[in-house]
């Protein structure tokens, strides 16, 4: 069953964030993950959303998603990610 990760993002350091984004995509492949959508908030319709940006990525299953998140390749980027932005990551399945 597919699993999805949704990241809500508030960029604090655009240069650090740009460097993170340039590298993070390569970490998905070994876990058969891919980005479905990246975008900026266009406006609130109901309630308050965290972040000005969002990313949605799909993995074949929750185990693959968790293995990606815990992988040395991704873990090595977390300090750069945290320097560049406030990020909330949440996993979802059916």
Where are these regions (language model features)?
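Low-complexity, intrinsically disordered Gly/Pro/Thr-rich segments
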Residues: 71-78
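C-terminal end-helix/capping segment
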Residues: 82-94
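Short, conserved catalytic or adaptor-binding loops enriched in Gly and charged residues
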Residues: 26-27, 80-82
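Short S/T/G/P-rich N-terminal loop/turn motif that feeds into the first structured element of a domain
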Residues: 1-70, 91-94
């Amino acid at each position: 069953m597919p699993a999805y990760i949704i990241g809500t993002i508030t960029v604090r350091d655009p240069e650090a964030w740009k460097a993170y984004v340039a590298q993070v995509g390569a970490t998905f492949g070994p876990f058969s993950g891919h980005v479905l959508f990246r975008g900026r908030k266009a406006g609130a319709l109901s309630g308050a959303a965290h972040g000005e940006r969002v990313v949605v990525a799909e993995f074949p299953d929750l185990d693959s998603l968790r293995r990606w998140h815990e992988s040395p390749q991704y873990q090595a980027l977390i300090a750069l990610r945290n320097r560049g932005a406030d990020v909330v990551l949440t996993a979802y399945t059916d």
